[in-house]
A protein has these predicted regions:
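Hydrophobic packing positions in regular secondary-structure scaffolds
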Residues: 1-168
Length: 168
């Protein structure tokens, strides 16, 4: 794990200032989302946006969910809703996408939903948003695992592991 020292942060800021995409991606690629979220707190908003644009969609979505709500709002406020849909929501598990959408006003939710490429995911998000956050419906996801009722327990467990990898 990379230690997030002052020197590391200063080096990253220099790389951002120089707009060295290759070096910045190299520094980010092995970091955990929680570490990148910690780095975010030491950057100004434009530096953070620059880094987000360099990450692949899955990493960007994971980092976004690691940010505290206030930092998430600052970032999302600066990005177009179409980009939020394509960069974050399209790369999130449905339950995480719903959690994110709950933080936004209804107009923003509708606009983001209109840009989600996966129509089924958009429908699932709309369905889950109907439930209060603290109810079973508000906490659940829509992904499920199916096994044959006649299978042995070890076969069921193997199949569940296989399907879980496909869902994730």
């Amino acid at each position: 794990m990379t230690e997030l020292t002052k020197e590391y942060i200063d080096n990253l800021k220099k790389i951002i200032e120089e707009k060295d995409d290759v070096k910045a991606r190299e520094l980010l690629k092995d970091l955990y989302p929680a570490d990148i979220a910690e780095i975010y707190q030491k950057l100004d908003l434009q530096e953070a946006i620059y880094l987000y644009m360099l990450m692949d969609g899955e990493q960007a979505a994971d980092v976004l969910m690691e940010l505290d709500e206030e930092d998430r709002h600052k970032l999302l406020k600066e990005l177009p809703n179409e980009l939020i849909a394509k960069r974050f929501v399209d790369n999130m598990e449905t339950d995480d996408a719903v959690d994110l959408m709950r933080e936004l006003d209804e107009d923003t939710q509708e606009e983001i939903l209109s840009h989600i490429e996966d129509v089924e995911q958009a429908g699932d998000i709309v369905d889950l948003l109907k439930y209060d956050e603290d109810t079973a419906g508000g906490l659940m996801g829509t992904e499920m695992i199916v096994v044959n009722e006649n299978w042995s327990m070890p076969k069921c467990i193997d199949e569940m592991r296989k399907q879980a990898e496909e869902v994730n």
